[in-house]
Structures are given as structure tokens and as C-alpha cells.
Amino acid sequence: MKEVIDTVGRRKTSVARVFMSPGKGRVIINKLPAEEYFRDEVKRQQALRPLALTEKMEDFDIKVNVHGGGVSGQTGAVSLAIARALTEFDESARAVLKKEKLLTRDPRMVERKKFGRKKARKRFQFSKR
């Protein structure tokens, strides 16, 4: 078994690279503790959900490099990358994570703006007369 597992997770325009190794449960995101990087408790729990579900919160040290997008996209990217790393370490975790749909890349992206319109689908105001 490899000492350090590195995986990639993507969501919207965010890309997260996770380096996971056996340790004491430290999570470092872009050289900051997870509590500082994701100040919002809900977003932090969302990002670390794969660890909570598999009850491996204290078993691994995780270093994350994440860039692009906003907080929501980065949260999803980190979550997917951690879930993928957990399955490489422990194949039995795959069933739990798959059931919770944490191993599925969310394909939803921002729809492009079309010409002749205000936004992707919104039209300019129509005047009959």
C-alpha cells in the first residue's frame, strides 16, 4: 500500500488535489487549517463528510490544494477528492460513499450567456407597442 495517496476532485470550475496519509486527523487546506479556510461550519462539514461517514476522521492527515471557483464549488471538489482517496485506502468504504453519492462527479456547470439575451435564458423586456 502507498504511504501517500493523491487524488483529484472537481466541481464547477474548482479543482482540488488531496494528499492523504495515515496520521492524527489534521486537515490542511491551502496551508490553512480546515477551520480557518472554511469558516462556515456547514461548508466545512460538507467538505469533510466522507471522513465523517466512514468514521475515519482521526485516522488520516490530509493536505489539500484547491483553486478556482467559489466556496460552494471548492467544497464539492474537496469532498469528491477525499472520497476518492478513502476508497484507494479502504475498498470497504466504497459502498458507504457510493450510497451517499459522494463518488459521483456533479456534471452541472454554468450555462453560457447567449447573444441577443440578457443572461443565459432571460430575455430583454418585450414591448408590444
Curated annotation (Swiss-Prot):
GO cellular component term, pick one: small ribosomal subunit
InterPro entries noted in UniProt: Ribosomal_Su5_D2-typ_SF (IPR020568), Ribosomal_uS9 (IPR000754), Ribosomal_uS9_bac/plastid (IPR023035), Ribosomal_uS9_CS (IPR020574), Ribsml_uS5_D2-typ_fold_subgr (IPR014721)
Alphabetical keyword list: Ribonucleoprotein, Ribosomal protein
GO biological process, one term: translation
GO molecular function: RNA binding; structural constituent of ribosome
Superkingdom of the organism of origin: Bacteria
Record NCBIfam families: PRK00132.1
Family: Belongs to the universal ribosomal protein uS9 family.
Protein name as annotated: Small ribosomal subunit protein uS9
Gene designation per UniProt: rpsI
